[in-house]
Amino acid sequence: MKVAYIAGPYRANTINRTVENIRNAEKMAIKYWKKGYAVICPHKNTALFDGICPDETWLRGDIEIMKRCDLVVMVPGWETSQGSVTERDIAVKIGIKVVEP
């Protein structure tokens, strides 16, 4: 089974917007589960863990997981997220297929 990684904005100015970002990533994850992929959705893995560790800790860990995936799926609005831009750039650099549904 191929593995898809969901990349998109997480952080926001309000908790409501952060929850909305998590929900958007969740919807994309469900879409790819239905397509037959095993899906890693980092938004759900560390949802609302804010303040426990520096944000860089989460991003480094997510990138390690992403490197083992077959596909990176960009959630709409990814361009506004520095973390998502970094994830996309690394995926392209190491040859992981990137899609923008």
Model regions: which residues?
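Catalytic phosphate/metal-binding cores of nucleic-acid and nucleotide-processing enzymes, i.e., regions
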Residues: M1-P101
